Amino acid sequence: MNINLVGIGLGNPELLTKAACNAISKSDIVIGAKRIVDSIRSDFVGKKFFLEYNTEKIADIIKSNAGSEISVIFSGDISLFSGGSKLFERLKAFKNCKINTFPGISSLSYLCAKTNIDISKVKILSFHGKDELLYHNIDSNEYTFIITSKGEGAKEICRKLISFGFFELDITLGENLSYDNERITTAKPGDFLDMDISDLNCMIIYNPDSDKAISFGLHDEVFARDKVPITKSEVRAVILSKLNISSDSICYDIGAGSGSVSIEMAGLAYEGKVYAVEKNPVAVELIKKNIHNFNAENIELI
């Protein structure tokens, strides 16, 4: 049984690769989400189409049609935030199943090509149905590509950038890429707030002042302190070096005080989580201030 996992690109049939066209043409059955199927249906007359995007339900359809050649189609490229990866793993359990993969043009490669940006310089994020730590990624990368969740999702990212103080960064927003109504706009975060943004969108944020350096032992004076004791800079530096915190570590700061250790933990564990535990009401307010001042999105105050 041949199963083809096909990336069809962004929706314009003209961007479908020749190999992908041949795979779909040879298939008896084509499975995919409605928007994706609708974009190619007229070019592949006579195929049996199933409108489905759930991995397990697709697997059931494949089981029920074991004697057929089947193409499962996905938007963009099957290697970038695609259900193709999950389905590939699921199909490994099938006996006598040959899995063929066909890459497509992704929104990332398309937008980078349109704007002359080297993909190798780009940090890739997705806010489509999940949260990411925005501040650190923008602060430490020259280019950040984001797949957003609908038009309002793009505006929410712009609001966050403004709250972080990133007023002057250039954002390139791509809408309805490859379609006749494609629009690519470069502007500041505030300029997008009153725009009518398509739900099919992605963006690249350019930060020419990005800083990839990660350090610890910040000067004591940079923290909000009041009368709450603070772990001194030199002590903090030794503690953090001994902890050997990685980017995805889960950290606990018990008796967090002013939150200086928590803040520095959060900078090191920028893809992880820091739990700052404190019972002193004055200290709790200081921790809140420091979280705000350092845009430490990955700290949870307990």
Can you say where each PLM-predicted feature lies in the sequence?
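A contiguous loop/helix-start segment that scaffolds small-molecule binding in enzyme catalytic cores
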Residues: N2-L5, E69-I70, Y143-V228
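Class I S-adenosyl-L-methionine
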Residues: M1-N100, S109, V274, E278, ...
